[in-house]
């Protein structure tokens, strides 16, 4: 009886808390399932799988050079085949479309379900021909940016399929979705994956304040929520710009159409989504004041690297953050009734620290984590216990996770979560030891087909996290298709449906009609497809 309980808890540890069991993993967890999770919470160095990837500062530099090459080509008339002809690919919109196609090409060949309509893969090996209107350097730079983006996706899924610390990896993906950015936002496109490895992975076992600051100062978030364009109305930069516009008007010249101003997007989403929650007690005036406090938070330019940025300070050369004092709104701020008299960058940092330790933040984060790991409607007592642990530890995330693990509600036999498409695909990869041969295009197209494209949520709120959101429409039918396609990629030597089911789910669920159905399947491949599509596999129990 005791062994049966431990076996069941081992399956929960690997599937409910982790990302799905690899072959042999349930046996490793069965002696002490809770201890198996606790052991993963010990900080370790980041995986070498990410070591060769460029940091965001390097990507910013490459992107700048790419745009400079494009601009130079446009000024030189490159892309014109003759007098009167329209310039080929000579505007920012078409350029962005081409970069987007390089970053998210369709799989070539393979199952038709992988080939999402409208997505076609360009030949990234082909240099520009003399007649295509683009200089070779321009195409080379675009290919390098695209390769960098694909390398990040490849590393992410190679790691998730092989890691022995799948609980920590699930936590990483939880926070990545909590601080969601989307590749659909052009300026943020190249930085979504780097943000996960640069801002989230190093702090997932640390303090929430450090995690929060790292994310909110990352180029991905600053660009996604438009803070790079936020300028204080009374800032030095705004004053100079206004004076210049007045001189232009006096000389009879047209003023620029785009005007400088405050952008509230980042401040609002930090309060509503990242910390306090929508019912966290803040008002519009708090959002405005906070937005003023973080004016000047921007991204590195080449001149900042060379020490000639003038108004730039507080630069993080690896992640690409910079504080521009000339764009910062001067003066004191009042947020949630507290006065902040700090100067410059320190003002926004002080507000972030207080938001991180606010009781509403403790409640909001605890509810989301409990919902992610236990149930769509988690027990209020569990949420309250986690919120208390968060506050008494002053935002220590490991203490928060430990409280979750040690709570009896988290191990209830009735607790379960329906897998998101990403959860489903990753758990199949782990159960079937499936690799994508350093080419993640088939994988990304599969997730697109299932409704969860990689780093592309529909809003800053991230991907939904309840069963109702993922079971609607034709989602279940698409999972059956995906199960069949993924079963094809399992090595022949591992195509034993019953053994695979027991290794991934434990022996307890693999009985009766379910086990009989796996044995009666027309072929081992069909049996694996039946396993992957089964309710037992689709739920994190």
Question: Language-model features: where?
Answer:
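Flexible, low-complexity segments enriched for small/polar residues
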Residues: 3-6, 11-25, 50-63, 70, ...
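Short, solvent-exposed helix-helix connector turns and helix-capping sites enriched
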Residues: 9, 31-32, 396
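N-terminal accessory alpha/beta regions
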Residues: 23-178, 182-203, 223-237, 243, ...
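A general structural motif at alpha-helix termini
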Residues: 30, 41, 215, 404-405, ...
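Active-site substrate-binding loop specific to GH73 endo-beta-N-acetylglucosaminidase modules
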Residues: 118, 123-138, 145, 152-156, ...
């Amino acid at each position: 009886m005791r062994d049966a309980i431990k076996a069941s808890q081992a399956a929960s540890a690997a599937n409910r808390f982790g990302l799905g069991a690899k072959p042999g993993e349930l046996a490793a967890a069965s002696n002490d399932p809770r201890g198996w999770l606790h052991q993963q919470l010990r900080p370790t160095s980041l995986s070498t799988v990410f070591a060769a990837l460029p940091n965001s500062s390097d990507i910013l530099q490459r992107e700048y050079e790419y745009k400079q090459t494009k601009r130079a080509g446009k000024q030189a008339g490159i892309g014109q085949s003759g007098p009167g002809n329209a310039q080929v690919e000579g505007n920012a919109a078409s350029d962005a479309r081409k970069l987007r196609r390089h970053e998210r090409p369709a799989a070539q060949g393979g199952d038709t379900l992988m080939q999402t309509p409208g997505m076609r893969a360009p030949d990234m090996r082909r240099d520009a021909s003399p007649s295509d209107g683009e200089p070779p350097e321009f195409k080379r730079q675009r290919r390098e940016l695209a390769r960098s983006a694909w390398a990040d996706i490849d590393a992410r899924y190679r790691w998730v399929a092989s890691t022995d610390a799948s609980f920590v990896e699930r936590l990483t993906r939880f926070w990545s979705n909590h601080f969601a950015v989307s590749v659909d936002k052009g300026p943020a496109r190249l930085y979504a994956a780097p943000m996960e490895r640069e801002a989230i992975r190093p702090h997932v076992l640390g303090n929430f304040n450090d995690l929060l600051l790292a994310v909110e100062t990352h180029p991905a978030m600053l660009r996604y929520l438009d803070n790079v364009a936020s300028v204080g109305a009374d800032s030095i930069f705004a004053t100079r710009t206004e004076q210049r516009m007045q001189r232009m008007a006096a000389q009879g010249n047209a003023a620029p159409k785009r005007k400088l101003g405050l952008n509230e997007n980042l401040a609002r989403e930090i309060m509503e989504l990242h910390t306090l929650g929508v019912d966290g007690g803040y008002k519009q005036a708090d959002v405005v004041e906070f937005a003023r406090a973080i004016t000047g938070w921007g991204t590195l330019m080449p001149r900042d690297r060379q020490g000639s940025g003038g108004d730039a300070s507080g630069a993080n050369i690896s992640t690409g953050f910079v504080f521009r004092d000339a764009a910062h709104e001067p003066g004191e701020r009042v947020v949630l009734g507290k006065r902040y008299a700090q100067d410059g960058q320190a003002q926004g940092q002080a507000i972030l620290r207080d938001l991180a330790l606010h009781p509403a933040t403790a409640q909001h984060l605890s509810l989301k984590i409990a919902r992610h790991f236990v149930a769509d409607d988690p027990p209020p007592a569990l949420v309250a216990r986690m919120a208390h642990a968060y506050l008494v530890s002053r935002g220590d995330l490991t203490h928060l996770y430990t409280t979750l693990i040690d709570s009896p509600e988290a191990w209830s036999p009735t607790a379960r979560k329906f897998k998101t498409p990403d959860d489903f695909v990753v758990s199949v990869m782990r159960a079937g030891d499936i690799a994508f041969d350093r080419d993640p295009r088939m994988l990304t197209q599969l997730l697109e087909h299932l409704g969860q494209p990689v780093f592309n949520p529909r809003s800053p709120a991230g991907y939904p996290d309840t069963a109702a959101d993922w079971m609607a429409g034709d989602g279940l039918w698409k999972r059956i298709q995906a199960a069949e396609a993924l079963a094809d990629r399992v090595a022949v030597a591992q195509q034993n449906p019953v053994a695979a089911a027991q290794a991934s789910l434990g022996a307890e669920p693999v009985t009766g009609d379910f086990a009989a159905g796996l044995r009666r399947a027309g072929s081992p491949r069909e049996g694996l497809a039946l396993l992957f599509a089964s309710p037992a596999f689709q739920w994190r129990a």
